[in-house]
Amino acid sequence: MQKLVILGSTGSIGKSTLSVVDNNPEQYQVFALVGGKNVELITEQCQQYQPRFVALDDEQAAAKLKENLTALGLKIEVLAGQKAIYELASHPEVDMVMAAIVGAAGLLPTLSAVQAGKKVLLANKESLVTCGQIFIDEARKSGAKLLPVDSEHNAIFQSLPPEAQEKVGFCPLAELGVSKIILTGSGGPFCTKPLNEFSQITPAQAVAHPNWSMGKKISVDSATMMNKGLEYIEARWLFNASADEMEIIIHPQSIIHSMVRYIDGSVIAQMGNPDMRTPIAHTMAYPNRIYAGVAPLDFFKLKELTFIEPDFARYPNLKLAIEAFAEGQYATTAMNAANEIAVEAFLNDQIRFTDIVEVNRQVVENIAPVQVKEIADVLHIDKLAREVAKQHILQF
């Protein structure tokens, strides 16, 4: 029985992880649940899974949760604040940590799990986007096992040779016969929408993804393809890939989740219905396989598989992310922080859809280049970039 901590249990990935646990109750025990402010849902999760610990970042929410659990007669220890979350992520009894807190808020808890040498199921993009080198170095030092949960990175991982899977972050792609990492993306809900209509896109339209069930922030990132930009940055770090070893393809059906091209002409792809329980189950059971509750792919119902070259005029955020990686860790950190603020402003009807990339670009251009050597540098840039982004938003 493996003990599992879920960082972000009330989010989309967290709920899918619990669904996989439901299908394999004899293999996994939920040791701790970690959430933000959704007291109602995490109360229900505590009733069902009865973890030993539950932690909320918000102290008032934690106090309310404690009342709820006491009223239900549940003897679950309720913790509050970041320090408690770090301690749960690195608890000596824990076997694996699902790192699924969205945004920069998930950075330090995930790092805590890595430094403790845990099996880390990495669903938090920002960990690598903001401090990729630090994460890879810490994982090598502690012996932590990094397993990518993002459907694209998980697909790449599955399509790589076993030697590469054992060297996440430092695998020698060329020596293993790999010529290209091919990152696929659906293109989002506006793949064919006329560009002159982009400024009228509403938050409700942007969060309605055609293939995947995701949270609001990630859905908007998919619509702007910032999601793919962040995944490009992640892939560069996870698979030790150069710019020349990366390729991005728009694949609207989201059936092929990513591919690896080899020097002998072979292309190995991972396919399946678009359901996050597949990569989650893969990382939880690796190197074995477990039932995920996902319907098998029916090839006879597939009408077509199409592939389109990315159009940077349609997806300027994707271009910005690629350029930011070339600039360095400070630029990707600043861009990520700006994007979180810009997407929130868009969802609150403060700026237009087309303004998101303008905020991101302005912040990246106005943050002075600095060398990122430690987490404190990352947190400083992140804070500064958020302040600059908020100032730019006031001008719209």
Curated annotation (Swiss-Prot):
GO BP annotations listed: isopentenyl diphosphate biosynthetic process, methylerythritol 4-phosphate pathway involved in terpenoid biosynthetic process
Entry's EC annotation: 1.1.1.267
Cross-referenced InterPro entries: DXP_reductoisomerase (IPR003821), DXP_reductoisomerase_C (IPR013644), DXP_reductoisomerase_N (IPR013512), DXPR_C (IPR026877), DXPR_C_sf (IPR036169), NAD(P)-bd_dom_sf (IPR036291)
Pathway: Isoprenoid biosynthesis; isopentenyl diphosphate biosynthesis via DXP pathway; isopentenyl diphosphate from 1-deoxy-D-xylulose 5-phosphate: step 1/6
Alphabetical list of SUPFAM superfamilies matching this protein: 1-deoxy-D-xylulose-5-phosphate reductoisomerase, C-terminal domain, Glyceraldehyde-3-phosphate dehydrogenase-like, C-terminal domain, NAD(P)-binding Rossmann-fold domains
Residues at which 1-deoxy-D-xylulose 5-phosphate binds: K125, S151, E152, S186, H209, S222, N227, K228, E231
Enzyme superclass (EC): oxidoreductase
Binding site for Mn(2+): D150, E152, E231
Keyword Metal-binding: yes
Keywords annotated in UniProt: Isoprene biosynthesis, Manganese, Metal-binding, NADP, Oxidoreductase
Residue sites binding NADPH per the record: T10, G11, S12, I13, G36, K37, N38, N124, E126, G215
Catalysed transformations (reactions): 2-C-methyl-D-erythritol 4-phosphate + NADP(+) = 1-deoxy-D-xylulose 5-phosphate + NADPH + H(+)
Superkingdom of origin: Bacteria
Cofactor: Mg(2+); Mn(2+)
Molecular function GO labels: 1-deoxy-D-xylulose-5-phosphate reductoisomerase activity; manganese ion binding; NADPH binding
Role played: Catalyzes the NADPH-dependent rearrangement and reduction of 1-deoxy-D-xylulose-5-phosphate (DXP) to 2-C-methyl-D-erythritol 4-phosphate (MEP).
UniProt xrefs under PANTHER family: 1-DEOXY-D-XYLULOSE 5-PHOSPHATE REDUCTOISOMERASE, 1-DEOXY-D-XYLULOSE 5-PHOSPHATE REDUCTOISOMERASE, CHLOROPLASTIC
Family statement: Belongs to the DXR family.
Name by which UniProt lists this protein: 1-deoxy-D-xylulose 5-phosphate reductoisomerase
Lineage of producing organism: Bacteria, Pseudomonadati, Pseudomonadota, Gammaproteobacteria, Pasteurellales
Gene from which the chain derives: dxr
